[in-house]
Amino acid sequence: MKTLLLTLVVVTIVCLDLGYTRRCFNQQSSEPQTNKSCPPGENSCYRKQWRDHRGTIIERGCGCPTVKPGIKLRCCESEDCNN
């Protein structure tokens, strides 16, 4: 019985992948490429793109925010997928 319980605990930990955090790029526009680990529970990355008087602006980070009209948004759910 103890063996069965231990097996179930191990399988649960492996399946849930406890402690896992998503990693996303977070550099802005033409800055050097950097990434960061997202907060626990944040499982997506985003890339926002828009134009203003400075040219094309790109913002990257964790999550999937809501945006105003005229801003292109791409959300994804794999490691470093928002480049």
Swiss-Prot record:
Any GO molecular function? toxin activity
Its Gene Ontology cellular component terms are: extracellular region
Signal sequence residues? 1-21
Q: Cellular location of this protein? A: Secreted
Q: Does the keyword Cell cycle apply?
A: no
Q: In which tissues is it expressed?
A: Expressed by the venom gland.
Which UniProt key words apply to this protein?
Acetylcholine receptor inhibiting toxin, Disulfide bond, Ion channel impairing toxin, Neurotoxin, Postsynaptic neurotoxin, Secreted, Signal, Toxin
Q: Which cysteines are joined by disulfide bonds?
A: C24-C45, C38-C62, C64-C75, C76-C81
Q: What is its main location?
A: secreted
The protein's role, per its UniProt record: Binds to muscle nicotinic acetylcholine receptor (nAChR) and inhibit acetylcholine from binding to the receptor, thereby impairing neuromuscular transmission.
Give the protein's recorded name: Short neurotoxin OKI-Ed
Q: Which organism is it from?
A: Laticauda semifasciata (Black-banded sea krait)
Which lineage ranks, top first, belong to the organism behind this chain? Eukaryota, Metazoa, Chordata, Craniata, Vertebrata
